[in-house]
Regions:
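Acidic/His/Gly-enriched intrinsically disordered linker/tail segments
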Residues: 83-90, 112-116, 124, 128-252
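Juxtacatalytic substrate-recognition/specificity segment
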Residues: 2-133, 137, 215-219
Length: 252
């Protein structure tokens, strides 16, 4: 399945790539190797993390093929040009930045590529820790990945909807966020941030490790209504989303 791919690896990561992509393979290896210790430390992970394989592809068709055949994940064909990566267990398929112009809606920006890979690595660590990844609400998993990768801090794709919603006093309820995919990305990270602020990092870790049925609120000792009220009041605090002080991964 990967017969024509070259390999660049260290003890923790294996990057598979095609000829001409060595630059991006090196970049990916460096990003992942630097990020994993920070992520595992955040989640208080003491056991060694399994070796991770990332496959860089240069065409949308190859991306779809490997997501389907290597990862065994159902995917629309052709997949949406906004889709750049897909993790599953300890494998991830990533559209190479060299293919962005032809096969995506994005322009390659090194810092955004870094945050994308960290986002996917957070999903991988969560999957290793959680009792049932499929039961985890999308807003929680995506919120966690957007928050810890700090995409929310720098990228309008993740940040603008929340900022605009707050400015216009148009904040969705939890039921809407749970029901709509785009809202999970737009607002999930704000809920994760609130949980970390209100309960501490240990509660984030506890939710990931204990939430087997998808009921995040139960682990928190809250109802959806009570948490939504507290979150809404918190998020409306003056300057909340523009604050640059937080505990988590650091921009480098």
């Amino acid at each position: 399945m990967l017969d024509n791919y070259l390999t660049l690896e260290n003890a923790q990561f294996e990057i598979r790539y095609v000829e001409g992509e060595h630059r991006f393979a090196q970049e990916a290896l460096g990003i992942l190797s630097t990020a994993l210790p920070s992520i595992t430390s955040y989640f208080l992970l003491s056991n060694p993390f399994p070796k991770v394989r990332a496959v860089l592809v240069t065409h949308r068709n190859e991306f779809d093929r490997l997501v389907r055949d290597l990862l065994r994940v159902e995917i629309e064909v052709p997949s949406h040009p906004a889709r750049l990566a897909q993790p599953q267990r300890t494998d991830m398929v990533v559209l190479s930045p060299s293919a962005y112009a032809s096969h995506s809606i994005f322009t390659y920006i090194p810092a955004q590529f870094r945050r994308l890979l960290i986002h996917e690595l957070v999903h991988m660590v969560e999957e290793q820790l959680t009792p049932d990844m499929e039961a985890s609400p999308r807003w929680w998993s995506e919120g966690l990945a957007v928050y810890l990768s700090e995409q929310w801090r720098y990228e309008d794709e993740f940040r603008k909807a929340a900022l605009d919603g707050i400015a216009q006093n148009n904040i969705p309820g939890f039921r809407q966020i749970e029901a709509e995919r785009t809202l999970a990305y737009d607002w999930g990270w704000t809920i994760v941030w609130f949980v970390e602020s209100a309960y501490g990092r240990h509660m984030i870790v506890r939710v990931v490790k204990e939430c087997a049925d998808g009921n995040v609120f139960s682990v928190l000792g809250e109802t959806a209504t009570s948490l939504e009220t507290r979150w809404r009041n918190w998020i409306l605090a003056e300057g909340r989303l523009t604050s640059q002080s937080r505990v988590g991964l650091r921009e480098t």
